[in-house]
Amino acid sequence: MGEIRSFLLVTIALMMGREIWALENSKCLLEQERLRAQVQQLETRVKQQQARIAQLMHEKEVQLLDKGQEDNFFDLGGKRQYADCSEIYNDGFKQSGFYKIKPHQSQAIFSVYCDMSDGGGWTVIQRRSDGRENFNRCWNDYENGFGNFVQNNGEYWLGNKNINLLTMQGDYTLKIDLTDFEKNSRFAQYKHFKVGDKKSFYELNFGEYSGTAGDSLSGTYHPEMQWWASHQRMKFSTRDRDNDNYKGNCAEEEQSGWWFNRCHSANLNGVYYQGPYTAETDNGVVWYTWHGWWYSLKSVVMKIRPNDFIPNVI
């Protein structure tokens, strides 16, 4: 009888053990299925993220191709502070690109494009190239500067404040490089270029002209027009700060900031049209003595350099 009882107990224990094992095995299988499903979900999410990253990288490449190759930016490591691009050039850095400068009276360092071609040492204060940048800006924008200081040939205005700080350091030459849509190029150069301070409303002053584009700034091309077309000693005007000699607001009509008289024979900050244009006013990128009032130029570079600049050939 005792043997039978022992046999039954062993049998019951074995059966319970099998049931417990089966239950545990079932739980393990369920856990495995759950983990396998989670892994599949994570793999799906990773693939989706990879696809999204690839899409964003493609879009970025398209944008860069559309904007043009990034230009060089040179960090000179703070070895010394340069007042303008001519000092950088004569310190042995001969490659065009963006550099940091700090004019003598400036409280801040700022970026600028240095044109190290054409004799080298040119500080670019304005550039037009493709019409991407809006030049119909308010006084504060023109005072502090705006535009693309990264891309190759990016359009920008260095800022009246910065141009004043540069030109008050000494005697500067302004060179203006102009190109039309027929791939012709001209230039205009002025000695003794200077932009006054804020109290003078950033008044424009310049000296003797030389070049191939004609002297649009002084208005001497036609004595009867000079009194209203000359930009000499004109204050800077914007749509919200009217300092011109016109009964209306030249900056508002021409949709740009500039040293307007009544109104202009040159407006290099004008609306970007492609060559000949029709508008209510002559508000294009205009250099009258080359293409007249009703032709808008393709590209403009305004750049300055000390009059007494002697390039270091080493």
From Swiss-Prot:
Query: What domain of life does the UniProt record list for this protein's source?
Result: Eukaryota
One GO BP on record is: platelet aggregation
Signal peptide residues on this chain, from the entry's feature table: 1-22
Matches recorded under SUPFAM superfamilies: Fibrinogen C-terminal domain-like (SSF56496)
- InterPro entries of this UniProt entry? FIB_ANG-like (IPR037579), Fibrinogen-like_C (IPR036056), Fibrinogen_a/b/g_C_1 (IPR014716), Fibrinogen_a/b/g_C_dom (IPR002181), Fibrinogen_CS (IPR020837)
Which keywords accompany this UniProt record? Adaptive immunity, Coiled coil, Disulfide bond, Immunity, Secreted, Signal
The set of disulfide-linked cysteines is: 85-114, 250-263
Q: Which residues form a coiled coil?
A: 25-59
- Its job: Immune suppressive molecule that inhibits antigen-specific T-cell activation by acting as a major ligand of LAG3. Responsible for LAG3 T-cell inhibitory function. Binds LAG3 independently from MHC class II (MHC-II). Secreted by, and promotes growth of, hepatocytes.
Question: What is said about its interaction partners and assembly?
Answer: Homodimer. Interacts (via the Fibrinogen C-terminal domain) with LAG3 (via Ig-like domains 1 and 2).
> Protein name, please?
Fibrinogen-like protein 1
What organism does the record attribute this protein to? Mesocricetus auratus (Golden hamster)
